[in-house]
Amino acid sequence: CRVMVTARAEGRHASQPRRDIATLKLARSLCRLGDGYLRPHAIPTMRAALRTIAAAQSSYAAQRVDAILEQGRVDEAMVAAGLDPEGVRRMRPLFYDTAAVTSLAAGNPESINVIPANALAYIDGRILPDQTRQGFIDLVHSHLGNDVQVDVFREQYSAGLESSFDAPIFGVIEEVVADRCDGAKVIPWQCAGSTDAKHLIPRGLPVFGFIPSKPLPPGMNEAGAHANNERIWLENVPFALEVLYDIVTRFCLRA
């Protein structure tokens, strides 16, 4: 849910600064976002993920994680599940509605001696499946305060989506992975990015973002996104093809 934040005030000559100019109103409001992690919540998929990770230690660890999540202490639950600081950092966005300030606009460098009447900020928001459009706007507004206006930017809103891991296809994925990877367990997971699921799930089609891949060799960085590190290891291509073929074949034969 991408939003635009607008601060307004009287514009005037820069020789007369004030505390209530638009740029300062906006700056003060944005600081209230803190680190951008706005609302903690464990959706069913990520509850199952933490429970599965913790269960690798013991059944007690899994029960303890469940108890901590019931109290809404998601950061503590990740640590209790056994994640190291880097693991917590990477997993944390999947337990929060988040807001990242990505662009600012105010005034004109050619008129640097003029205090602008408007100042704008653009926020890329990522919302969990239980959040709504208005709910997120209200959440952002509650952090920013009343000095600014918050609007959805160019109608760029997509609901958070989640497929049930109780679906039959998920069971086949678990079975094939266990067969081909020495009994490895599949951990349900949520994606913090935007995918074609937003077009398919509303039409009743469950979507699972599953890309089979072996661990990368020591010293090789994992793939990233939107840069020259958005890649796949070539030796994983035939492995992925074989696993996916096996999954589709088994699933269709049982249908």
Please identify what each model-predicted range represents.
Residues 157, 183-242, 246-254:
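Zn-dependent metallopeptidase/amidohydrolase metal-coordination segment
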Residues 108-113, 216:
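Short beta-strand/turn micro-motifs at beta-sheet edges
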Residues 30-39, 60-63, 164-214:
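Active-site-adjacent substrate-binding region
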Residues 7, 125-127:
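Hydrophobic beta-strand positions in extracellular immunoglobulin-like domains
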Residues 111-122, 136:
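Glycine-rich, aromatic-lined ligand/substrate-binding cores of catalytic
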Residues 153-165:
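Short proline/glycine- and acidic-rich turn/helix-capping motifs at secondary-structure junctions
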Residues 1-4, 14-104, 114, 129-150:
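Acidic-enriched catalytic cores of C-N bond-cleaving enzymes acting on peptides and small amides
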